[in-house]
């Protein structure tokens, strides 16, 4: 039976920046419109965290029962390592997704009821990433889904629930955050190219191959860097977003130098940290820019 620490590891807490950063970015965009509502931001954060934990457990369950996780590096796999039964991991996934759905329902009803449909699509996307008979994560569409759900959907959704409108500042943040979120998955799938290929999990990294996947990762980081300068058109204070550059460069180091396997594990951590620092810095800059 898995210990509490193993259940926590199975939730993959290092992926939580993917949940937190879009909400921070969207709230900063709402603050730019003089419309930040902090209790709505907290509700959005609850939705995002619950969904990310839910999708991580769902991936553990789905990959585990398929045998995809039998020869993995990285965080603990509860089902693949036979530390927990598939049913218990599935229950954890469904519980997390249900809590996210409940928080999302409350947020939508208090903001814009049509967002319920968006939430339903998000939950379906979380499950179908590796679940179902034809998971899109096994067909090379995982990166696109991460970009959409953790970029435009999460950032602009957060901005809209607070401001009831979106603008180009929110869109720029959405694209940058989506690119950074996508880069985390690209790094993960770069590490897993050998095992994914053996398991017939045809991720985008498997399709592109090692060299082009490394180029894609660096290109996604560059997108966020360019958009930092674009956001300076709103307020010069957005230059503070460049505080994340050293973290991004550190993350990119092992990718540029051709390292693989376990040597890429720190890349996921550093990329997620860079994304969170960037989102906090730019959101703070936008809020301060409206006060100054």
UniProtKB/Swiss-Prot annotation:
**Per the entry, which co-factors are needed?**
Mg(2+)
Its EC number(s): 2.5.1.74
Q: How is the cofactor bound?
A: Can also use Fe(2+) or Zn(2+), with lower efficiency.
GO BP annotations listed: menaquinone biosynthetic process; vitamin K biosynthetic process
Membrane-spanning segments: 35-55, 101-121, 137-157, 166-186, 220-240, 271-291
Key word Cell membrane present in the record? yes
* GO terms, molecular function: 1,4-dihydroxy-2-naphthoate polyprenyltransferase activity; prenyltransferase activity
**Entries under NCBIfam families matching the protein:** menA, PRK06080.1-3
User: Can you say what this protein is called?
Assistant: 1,4-dihydroxy-2-naphthoate octaprenyltransferase
Identify the species of origin.
Mycobacterium tuberculosis (strain ATCC 25618 / H37Rv)
């Amino acid at each position: 039976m898995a210990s509490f620490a193993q259940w926590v590891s199975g939730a993959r807490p290092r992926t939580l920046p993917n949940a937190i950063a879009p909400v921070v970015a969207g709230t900063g965009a709402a603050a730019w419109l003089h419309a930040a509502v902090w209790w709505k931001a907290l509700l959005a954060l609850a939705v995002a965290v619950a969904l990310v934990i839910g999708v991580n457990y769902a991936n553990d369950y789905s990959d585990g029962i398929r045998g995809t996780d039998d020869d993995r590096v990285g965080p603990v796999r509860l089902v693949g390592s036979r530390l927990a039964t598939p049913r218990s991991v599935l229950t954890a996934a469904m519980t997390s997704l249900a809590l996210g759905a409940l928080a999302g329902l409350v947020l939508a009803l208090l903001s814009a009821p049509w967002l319920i449909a968006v939430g339903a699509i998000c939950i379906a996307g979380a499950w179908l990433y590796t679940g179902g008979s034809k998971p899109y994560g096994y067909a090379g569409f995982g990166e696109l889904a991460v970009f959409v759900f953790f970029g435009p959907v999460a950032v602009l959704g957060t901005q809209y629930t607070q401001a009831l409108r979106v603008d180009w500042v929110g869109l720029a943040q959405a694209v940058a955050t989506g690119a950074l979120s996508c880069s985390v998955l690209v790094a993960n799938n770069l590490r897993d190219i050998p095992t994914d290929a053996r398991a017939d999990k045809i991720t985008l990294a498997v399709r592109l191959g090692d060299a082009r996947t490394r180029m894609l990762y660096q290109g996604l980081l560059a997108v966020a860097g360019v958009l930092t300068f674009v956001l300076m058109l709103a307020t010069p204070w957005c230059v503070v977003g460049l505080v994340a550059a050293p973290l991004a460069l550190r993350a990119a180091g092992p990718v540029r130098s051709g390292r693989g396997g376990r040597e890429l594990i720190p890349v996921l951590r550093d990329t997620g940290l860079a994304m969170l620092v960037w989102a906090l810095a730019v959101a703070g800059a936008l809020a301060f820019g409206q006060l100054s």
